């Protein structure tokens, strides 16, 4: 049986993930080697070694989650436990959190930085998938079905936004929206939910208005202002986007060559994180960019295909949530690099430097691989199962065939 299950894994998905991680590791070294020495005063391979360590840890988690039956993740006690730990971790950040980039979003443990918000993304996906799978029979009941998980998600998003980390809060909100829309409720319930959301927004509007200076800080307003014409703000909020444009245009079709980027020499401060795609464009040209987009697109499409094929509501919603996370995060990062949307500090999945993000993504991909394995295994089992002749029950057929 184990042999059959191992044969049922989607190895095209696994191969795409391996390619993304390997390519990402190479680009983290290329984009961070100058920054590490000139800006942080550490060895040129400092960020590379940290990313490699995260990749090993994430790879181990991927294997564990790929072998672990995903249905066990829907257990009520497990769900309550991870949700409680997540909320307590987010609250603890206000007391013990380390401030970096104007956000108190990290726990500093020794020489390591852990960002709980990254892991909360997966917790919310697991929670929503389990709750909505369980509520399928009464999901159209607004107050007992669809609404309570929405409230819980809003509380989590609120705690993250207060750090303030609006990028992560926005991603979780968008993932939740995708999952809620795919949870199976009727059009009438959607209308009721929109009305309820409108009422809640009206009620919290005075709080938003009174705290608008904290929400819309000078830096955030500047990002929106520079969106229309970054060259107008070339010495302030538009600087990173302009240097990103220079990197993309310098790369052209074939690029300047691996390791030959000019913009990573202090012109792009976040060359190994938010703006790593600009360095890829500069060094490897349009072919490098298309290679990454193709692989990310393949993973997302494969994820939604697995969700469509999965007959189990929990597995299907889980695959939708994981695929949505990759798609949304990729779009926000690429939109910021190309100047289509304001810069949010969101990294590019599998490619950008970031240990917490990489471990979370590989753990999520392990779950997706496990779902795909069960889907394929079930399909193969159905194909091999003989059809019962008219008037004969399935159990009788099994006895007839195998005795």
Swiss-Prot record:
EC numbers on record: 2.4.99.28
Regions that span the bilayer: 14-34, 52-72, 81-101, 109-129, 142-162, 166-186, 190-210, 286-306, 310-330, 331-351, 355-375
Major site of localization recorded for this protein: membrane
Associated pathway: Cell wall biogenesis; peptidoglycan biosynthesis
The entry's keywords: Cell cycle, Cell division, Cell membrane, Cell shape, Cell wall biogenesis/degradation, Glycosyltransferase, Membrane, Peptidoglycan synthesis, Transferase, Transmembrane, Transmembrane helix
GO cellular component terms, A-Z: cell division site; plasma membrane
Induction info: Expression is regulated by YofA.
InterPro entries assigned: Cell_cycle_FtsW-rel_CS, FtsW/RodA
Family named by the database record: Belongs to the SEDS family. FtsW subfamily.
Extracellular face of the membrane: 35-51, 102-108, 163-165, 211-285, 352-354
Cytoplasmic side of membrane: 1-13, 73-80, 130-141, 187-189, 307-309, 376-403
Compartments where found: Cell membrane
Topology of the protein relative to the lipid bilayer: Multi-pass membrane protein
GO BP field: cell division; cell wall organization; peptidoglycan biosynthetic process; regulation of cell shape
Role played: Peptidoglycan polymerase that is essential for cell division.
Molecular function terms, GO-annotated: lipid-linked peptidoglycan transporter activity; peptidoglycan glycosyltransferase activity
Name of protein: Probable peptidoglycan glycosyltransferase FtsW
UniProt catalytic activity: [GlcNAc-(1->4)-Mur2Ac(oyl-L-Ala-gamma-D-Glu-L-Lys-D-Ala-D-Ala)](n)-di-trans,octa-cis-undecaprenyl diphosphate + beta-D-GlcNAc-(1->4)-Mur2Ac(oyl-L-Ala-gamma-D-Glu-L-Lys-D-Ala-D-Ala)-di-trans,octa-cis-undecaprenyl diphosphate = [GlcNAc-(1->4)-Mur2Ac(oyl-L-Ala-gamma-D-Glu-L-Lys-D-Ala-D-Ala)](n+1)-di-trans,octa-cis-undecaprenyl diphosphate + di-trans,octa-cis-undecaprenyl diphosphate + H(+)
One Pfam family cited in the UniProt record for this chain: FTSW_RODA_SPOVE
EC main group: transferase
């Amino acid at each position: 049986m184990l042999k059959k299950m191992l044969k049922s894994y989607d190895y095209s998905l696994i191969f795409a993930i391996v390619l993304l991680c390997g390519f990402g590791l190479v680009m983290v070294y290329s984009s961070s080697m100058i920054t590490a020495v000139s800006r942080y005063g550490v060895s040129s391979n400092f960020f590379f070694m940290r990313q490699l360590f995260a990749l090993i840890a994430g790879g181990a988690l991927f294997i564990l989650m790929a072998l672990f039956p995903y249905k066990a993740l829907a257990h009520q006690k497990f769900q309550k436990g991870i949700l409680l730990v997540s909320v307590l971790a987010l609250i603890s950040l206000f007391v013990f959190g380390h401030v970096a980039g104007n956000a108190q979003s990290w726990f500093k443990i020794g020489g390591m930085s852990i960002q709980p918000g990254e892991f909360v993304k997966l917790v919310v996906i697991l929670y929503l998938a389990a709750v909505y799978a369980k509520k399928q029979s009464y999901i159209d009941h607004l107050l007992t079905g669809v609404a309570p998980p929405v409230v819980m998600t809003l509380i989590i998003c609120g705690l993250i936004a207060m750090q303030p980390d609006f990028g992560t809060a926005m991603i979780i909100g968008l993932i939740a929206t995708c999952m809620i829309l795919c949870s199976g409720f009727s059009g009438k319930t959607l209308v009721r939910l929109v009305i309820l959301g409108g009422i809640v927004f009206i009620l919290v509007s005075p709080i938003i208005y009174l705290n608008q200076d904290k929400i819309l800080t000078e830096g955030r307003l500047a990002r929106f202002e520079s969106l229309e014409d970054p060259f107008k703000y070339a010495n302030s909020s538009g600087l990173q986007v302009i240097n990103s444009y220079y990197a993309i245009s310098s790369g052209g079709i074939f690029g300047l060559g691996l390791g030959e980027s000019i913009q990573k020499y202090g012109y792009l401060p976040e060359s190994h994180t938010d703006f790593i795609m600009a360095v890829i464009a500069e060094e490897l040209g349009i072919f490098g960019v298309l290679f990454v987009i193709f692989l990310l697109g393949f993973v997302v499409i494969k994820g939604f295909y697995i969700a469509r094929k999965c007959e189990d509501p929990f597995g299907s919603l889980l695959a939708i949530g994981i695929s949505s996370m990759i798609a949304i995060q990729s779009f926000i990062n690429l939109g910021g690099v190309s100047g289509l949307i304001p810069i949010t500090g969101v990294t590019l999945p599998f490619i950008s430097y970031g240990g917490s993000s990489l471990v979370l993504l590989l753990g999520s991909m392990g779950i997706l691989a496990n779902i795909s394995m069960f889907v394929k295994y079930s399909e193969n089992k159905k194909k091999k199962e003989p059809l019962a002749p008219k008037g004969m029950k399935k159990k009788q057929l099994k006895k007839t065939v195998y005795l």
